[in-house]
Design a protein with these regions (language model features):
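A broad, low-specificity signal marking well-ordered, structured residues that form hydrophobic/aromatic
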Residues: 23, 74, 100
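Short, surface-exposed binding/anchoring microloops in extracellular/periplasmic proteins
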Residues: 17-45
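Short, compact, well-ordered microdomains
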Residues: 80-120
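Positively charged, low-complexity intrinsically disordered regions
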Residues: 6, 38-39, 62
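Short, Lys/Arg-enriched N-terminal segments with co-localized hydrophobic residues
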Residues: 1-16
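Acidic, aromatic-enriched beta-alpha/helix-loop junctions
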Residues: 43-92
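A generic structural signal for short, non-catalytic loop/turn and secondary-structure boundary residues
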Residues: 2, 18, 69, 84-86, ...
């Protein structure tokens, strides 16, 4: 497999597969589901190798924050009707009142928000 301008070229298949990011968040677990702030405790993450998502692991929220601060990129992903993951949005850190939240969009809310990912 070769990398060329952000794409992976599969020598055997001769097709281009776009790499979304370094890591993909596919599910979330909230600290307290009754808390309206919705703070994530941990996430299920897979590596994006350009052809598929691999190596599913559970990571603590603080590890995701540290990775993003160290320039490791994340996006969300959702399963379609065929059970295949589709790329969601880029995950960012949004600091509100001095607290770092992981979100897909900046806003003034004191909560994590990765849209409507599967919960575990």
């Amino acid at each position: 497999m070769y990398v060329k301008r952000g794409f992976y070229f599969n020598i055997l298949g001769g097709s281009f597969m776009e790499k979304w990011t370094d890591k993909v968040i596919v599910a979330v677990h909230y600290e307290d589901t009754n808390d309206p702030r919705r703070v994530i405790e941990k996430v299920k993450v897979e590596d994006d190798d350009g052809d598929s998502l691999k190596n599913k692991v559970v990571m603590l929220r603080k590890s995701v924050v540290a990775d993003i601060e160290n320039n490791i990129s994340y996006v969300t992903a959702y399963k379609d009707d065929d059970g295949k993951y589709k790329e969601g949005k880029k995950v960012i850190i949004d600091i509100v009142n001095g607290v770092k939240y992981i979100k897909t969009e900046k806003n003034d809310k004191t909560e994590d928000n990765l849209d409507k990912l599967e919960e575990f």
